[in-house]
Each structure stands twice: as C-alpha cells, then as structure tokens.
Design a protein with these regions (language model features):
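Serine-dependent carboxylesterase/thioesterase catalytic core
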Residues: 4-6, 10-12, 25-27, 33, ...
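The serine-hydrolase catalytic nucleophile loop
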Residues: 12-21
Length: 93
C-alpha cells in the first residue's frame, strides 16, 4: 500500500508552525500531512504525542523529523504503521 500520510515532527525551540511552508506543497502532491505539536517537556511526552498522531492516520505513515525531531521519530518509528523515517538536519541513531 502506498504511503499517503506524512507526519512532520519539529525540532527543539520550535513548534509545528515551522512546517507551514512545506505542508501545502506536500498536500498539493496528494499527501495527507499532519504537523505534530510537541510540548518539549520530555522525550517520552513528545514520543507519546507523535504516536497519537500516527494512530489517527488511516494507513501507512512516513515520519519526518527535523533536528531534535529526529530523536522523536526514531523512538516512535517502531509503530507498525510507519513505513519510513526521514531525517532533516536531524539527530539520527
């Protein structure tokens, strides 16, 4: 099944609005895009928030993480719905 859902995870000292210029471009290509709004209170909290976003998607998900978001997608990436991880200037395993 092709991936049609993309979940974007922002880095530290940022929020989901950092993806505002990217989201319409991906949507124009036919993707359903969600920008996670992490609290940045702890890694565990941010992973839980990202996992909730994954659970709301109706099929395979591509996770995209910027900066600290790379750590978050690495932890959340073990979900069976996740088809791949994209690291954008991110901390990778």
């Amino acid at each position: 099944m092709p991936v049609k859902n993309i979940v974007l995870v922002h880095g530290a000292w940022a929020d989901g609005s950092n993806w505002l210029k990217v989201i319409p471009k991906l949507e124009a290509l036919g993707f359903h895009v969600t920008a996670v709004q992490n609290t940045l209170t702890s890694l565990a909290d941010d992973v839980a928030t990202t996992r909730r976003a994954i659970a709301l998607e109706d099929g395979p998900v591509l996770l995209v993480g910027h900066s600290y978001g790379g750590v978050v997608i690495t932890e959340a990436g073990d979900d069976s719905k996740v088809s791949g991880l994209v690291y954008v200037a991110a901390f990778a395993p």
